Amino acid sequence: MLDNTRLRIAIQKSGRLSDDSRELLARCGIKINLHTQRLIAMAENMPIDILRVRDDDIPGLVMDGVVDLGIIGENVLEEELLNRRAQGEDPRYLTLRRLDFGGCRLSLATPVDEAWDGPAALDGKRIATSYPHLLKRYLDQKGVSFKSCLLNGSVEVAPRAGLADAICDLVSTGATLEANGLREVEVIYRSKACLIQRDGEMAQSKQQLIDKLLTRIQGVIQARESKYIMMHAPSERLEEVIALLPGAERPTILPLAGEQQRVAMHMVSSETLFWETMEKLKALGASSILVLPIEKMME
């Protein structure tokens, strides 16, 4: 029996989002042993329970108020939302924030030897998918009628097996499509992981914990997107150096012992620092350029 005074968070037990979700919670300072086969794990240092479940169960657990928070792919969330609306329900939840992992796209794919002149080419065709509602919404908007072939796995083999004329499936690199004689022809939905919260009243202690967790998640994401940069630079070219680092805050400038014309610069940059940028910094006279990852960050 779950303790209702503890914050309940549902994450994917295994699969595409599992490792990233676990890493995010760990970097937020939640100490928990997720290396066992237990479906419910209790945090050691916070009143938090982690439920490890199938990804397509997470939206329902949040919408039905069984858990307080869930980390889920937007594609799975949107499919469940459309499914419930199709059954006459009015599902409610709050999206707290989009996360920086789990990126994918839901795409239409057809056999490589078939011509493609847009979605109209699928009119009257049979399409295999695990996302029938997202597919229907997209093709309805295009005025295309089709027959759906619902598969919960190995969707890419459907055309070769004679089950469908085309597929609608998640794509990352496209290698699986190519291996099955298919090509990606149209992206119908782009997705990332997101953090969602159940609708309705929340105990003050839980809401305070959620607010703390959101602040930490923001810090983790900012840290991953930022770099700490240190270098020595000519005093007379500081503004040129700073101009090469868009997104950087104004730097900390420190004197160098025994140097009158050069200073030490420290700054946080939210931009990716490419080799080309470092070469331009060097051309301006910068030296000892260090680019370091940031573990935690709070504004």
Swiss-Prot record:
Gene Ontology molecular-function annotations: ATP binding; ATP phosphoribosyltransferase activity; magnesium ion binding
EC top class, as a word: transferase
Keyword line: Amino-acid biosynthesis, ATP-binding, Cytoplasm, Glycosyltransferase, Histidine biosynthesis, Magnesium, Metal-binding, Nucleotide-binding, Transferase
A GO cellular component annotation in the UniProt record: cytoplasm
UniProt pathway: Amino-acid biosynthesis; L-histidine biosynthesis; L-histidine from 5-phospho-alpha-D-ribose 1-diphosphate: step 1/9
Principal place of residence: cytoplasm
Location of the protein in the cell: Cytoplasm
Catalytic activity: 1-(5-phospho-beta-D-ribosyl)-ATP + diphosphate = 5-phospho-alpha-D-ribose 1-diphosphate + ATP
Regulation: Feedback inhibited by histidine.
Obligatory cofactor(s): Mg(2+)
EC number(s) recorded for this UniProt protein: 2.4.2.17
GO biological process: L-histidine biosynthetic process
Entry superkingdom: Bacteria
Coiled-coil residue windows: none
Its job: Catalyzes the condensation of ATP and 5-phosphoribose 1-diphosphate to form N'-(5'-phosphoribosyl)-ATP (PR-ATP). Has a crucial role in the pathway because the rate of histidine biosynthesis seems to be controlled primarily by regulation of HisG enzymatic activity.
Subunit and partners: Equilibrium between an active dimeric form, an inactive hexameric form and higher aggregates. Interconversion between the various forms is largely reversible and is influenced by the natural substrates and inhibitors of the enzyme.
Family: Belongs to the ATP phosphoribosyltransferase family. Long subfamily.
Stated name of the protein: ATP phosphoribosyltransferase
Gene, per the UniProt record: hisG
